[in-house]
Every structure is written in C-alpha cells, then in structure tokens.
Amino acid sequence: LGERDLQLGWAKAGLIVGHSHQGDHGRSVSLDTQADRHYIQLDRKNFKLDSLHFHQQSEHTVEGKPYPMELHLVHRDPQSGNLAVMGIFVDEDKSDPHTPDEPLDKFLDQIAGGGSDADVTLDPAVFIPSRPDQFYRYEGSLTTPNYDSNVSWLVMRDPLKVDSEQMTKMKA
C-alpha cells in the first residue's frame, strides 16, 4: 500500500489527554480524542484514535523475527464500530541516545511514575515510524479480550527505535 491509502490525521493534531492503567494484559492508555483531529483514514473511512497499549514481546513477526515490544494504536470507526489497529514494533537502539526532554520521554515518565493508574498527555506523532507509508496489512481480529473481529491490521515495517532507559519505562 502507498501513502495515499493511509492518512494519519493525528500526525499534526497535537497533545491528547488520556488515562493510563496497568491491567492483566499490560499497560493500556485510553484517550480522550476528537474525531475530527485524531484519526487515520483508511479506504476512505475515518477511524478515530481510541486507545493504545504495549505488548512485551511483539505479537507479530517479520520473517520469523520477533521484537522486544509492540505498540498498538487502536482506532475505531464511529459509525460501524470496526477497528483499525496500527502495530508498531519497538526495538532498542544502542547507538542513538535520546535527550531527556523528548516528548516520548515525557510520556513514558508519566506512565512509569503513575503506578497502576495515571493521567497522561501525549502527542501520538512520537510513535510515527520513519516511513509510515511502509506497512503490512491484513484483516483479522483482536488478540486480547473481547477478541473483536472486523479488524484491519496495519503493521508498520520500520520499528520505533528507543534507548535502553525508554525500553525499561515501557516495560514497567
């Protein structure tokens, strides 16, 4: 698929307020988003950004290779209820230290320091891989309860690169 098939409406939408919760299936963040600003467009349909969560050990693999983590950005079509989930691999990059004031660090500090529950703000653009037009797509279902079907999966080809400190915070 090319860039024209997927548009990231939230790429320049700015900060989102949300609530982080540590549950049985890991860390999830529910988001208070606006349908006209925080969406992706796929197949000419808008899917509102609804939540995000992390999986330790990626659920997807590429040529048999798993990644240490996978981030899921869950989007919902407000009319049909169908989902579009953007899967982003997370990999540790030992050669690229990040500065402490990066937006990703601020977000990770909020979820790591908030215990099991925390209010957060984030700019979802921090998760955009270097080539967002390069992804694998398939139709499937959720891998966690309630196991909804009618899910369009978009698994980004390029991983989000983080340093070891950021990886530790994501796993907290």
What role is predicted for each listed range?
Residues L1-A172:
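Alpha-carbonic anhydrase
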